[in-house]
Amino acid sequence: MAELQIRKKEKKSGDGIGTMVDFLLANARLVLGVGGAAMLGIATLAVKRLIDRATSPPSDKEAEEKAEQKSIEESWKEAVLKKASPTLRRKEDLEHHCAPLSLPDPSQKMPEATGTSQVKASDEIKKIPICFTLQERLLNYHTHHASVPEVQMEEARQLVLDIKKELQEFLHAKHPEMPFLALHLGGSFGNRLPMSCLDHACLIMPLVLEPDLWCVIPGQKTILSDPNFCMVKRIDLEYTSRGSSPWDRFLVGAYLSSRTMVQSLHKTIVGSINWPAIGTVLDCTIKPDITSDELKLEVVHPNGHMIIRILPMAVIKDADLLAHCCATAPAENLWQRSFYKKEVSRLQELDSSDSGIRLKCLQILKGICRDCPSLCHLNSTHLRHILLHLSTESSDWTETALADRFLQVLEELIGYLDKGFLPSYFNDKLNLFSSLKAEDIEELGYGLYQVFSEPDDVLKRER
């Protein structure tokens, strides 16, 4: 009876403590929030269980310990879920997704991939960057960007030949007294070399000068003292009167004036030839350039646009002299020695002797100069002479050495620009950079350095 009364008092005392704890937790939720109240509830519940364990009989301790453990675990899980931050949850998710996967059992059949998963897999494969060597990029650039298909090249060549024929017939009819030789194709069209683009062509207009009436004065012996230019002098005027040569009409003083000749031809080509009618017959539009000091024809055909330059060339013995009549020329009777035939012939001989890639490298370089505005002052003559100079220094010009030779050409060009002097391969006194201004050289040097340091930026460009 006494024990029963003691238990009732202990139970009443325990109920009082529980009521007080519930009151504290209810108010703590208002002050601390749900998470804080949960943590406080765990601690308070632990204290309460300790008090109950101390006052309860030994037979009830095991059941109460199990209930206590379960209550604490549930309260802890609830508190963690309520208290956990989004950052921690993301971290747990990441760890879950990044967990190592076990290898599938070979005996089990793999599930068949759906159409969507196959598309996603192919898209992911396409996104994987493919790394190419410089050698591979150069060959790809040569094939897809620096080479014109043979069919297109032949069509453009035939169009230029048709225009040449019309011009030739008109000049013979207009000036029968002038001993013009037959016009012929110049440049890559004339040599049937591979081309990087079809936006330009040239027609050579040979002027046959009598060797006993004309002589070439080297540039060093003229008042300009410039080896890049020469003059054509009329000789034996004491014994052969003026007018003995059909070219005497273009004399200024005792010298054959390139400017007077070009201006006379310009008037004929611009004002006397019915280019609209010729263009209609050839299915194109032909317009002579009336603003330029040079002889140019602008041709628009179904496949694109083309500029045809007409170059008067005096032929004296073994010298080919191009008329130099630009507005900035220091005199009106200047002629410039052309080594084009020798340049191309020498490159072809070298490539044939060692199965080289000099002409292929030339195509790539011409394409890069076309794609980079900063390299517009670098012309084909510069590139041909650089390749000829390097051919005397480097012996390996096989296709496997294309990348090395390409970088070497750029490096040599930068070196020559730094000196401001690129000697001609056939006459080391001639400076092929003499026509460039200081700002042109600076721009070229910067552009070449960019190509040399980051060639992929140029080679990956689309046409």
Curated annotation (Swiss-Prot):
<feature type="region of interest" description="Disordered">
    <location>
        <begin position="87"/>
        <end position="119"/>
    </location>
</feature>
<dbReference type="GO" id="GO:0007005">
    <property type="term" value="P:mitochondrion organization"/>
</dbReference>
<feature type="compositionally biased region" description="Basic and acidic residues">
    <location>
        <begin position="89"/>
        <end position="98"/>
    </location>
</feature>
<dbReference type="InterPro" id="IPR046906">
    <property type="entry name" value="Mab-21_HhH/H2TH-like"/>
</dbReference>
<protein>
    <recommendedName>
        <fullName>Mitochondrial dynamics protein MID49</fullName>
    </recommendedName>
</protein>
<comment type="function">
    <text>Mitochondrial outer membrane protein which regulates mitochondrial organization. It is required for mitochondrial fission and promotes the recruitment and association of the fission mediator dynamin-related protein 1 (DNM1L) to the mitochondrial surface independently of the mitochondrial fission FIS1 and MFF proteins. Regulates DNM1L GTPase activity.</text>
</comment>
<dbReference type="Pfam" id="PF21297">
    <property type="entry name" value="MID51-like_C"/>
</dbReference>
<keyword id="KW-0472">Membrane</keyword>
<keyword id="KW-1000">Mitochondrion outer membrane</keyword>
<dbReference type="GO" id="GO:0090314">
    <property type="term" value="P:positive regulation of protein targeting to membrane"/>
</dbReference>
<keyword id="KW-0496">Mitochondrion</keyword>
<dbReference type="InterPro" id="IPR045909">
    <property type="entry name" value="MID49/MID51"/>
</dbReference>
<comment type="similarity">
    <text>Belongs to the MID49/MID51 family.</text>
</comment>
<feature type="transmembrane region" description="Helical">
    <location>
        <begin position="25"/>
        <end position="47"/>
    </location>
</feature>
<dbReference type="GO" id="GO:0005739">
    <property type="term" value="C:mitochondrion"/>
</dbReference>
<keyword id="KW-1133">Transmembrane helix</keyword>
<dbReference type="GO" id="GO:0005741">
    <property type="term" value="C:mitochondrial outer membrane"/>
</dbReference>
<feature type="topological domain" description="Cytoplasmic">
    <location>
        <begin position="48"/>
        <end position="463"/>
    </location>
</feature>
<feature type="topological domain" description="Mitochondrial intermembrane">
    <location>
        <begin position="1"/>
        <end position="24"/>
    </location>
</feature>
<dbReference type="InterPro" id="IPR049097">
    <property type="entry name" value="MID51-like_C"/>
</dbReference>
<keyword id="KW-0812">Transmembrane</keyword>
<dbReference type="Pfam" id="PF20266">
    <property type="entry name" value="Mab-21_C"/>
</dbReference>
<dbReference type="InterPro" id="IPR024810">
    <property type="entry name" value="MAB21L/cGLR"/>
</dbReference>
<dbReference type="GO" id="GO:0090141">
    <property type="term" value="P:positive regulation of mitochondrial fission"/>
</dbReference>
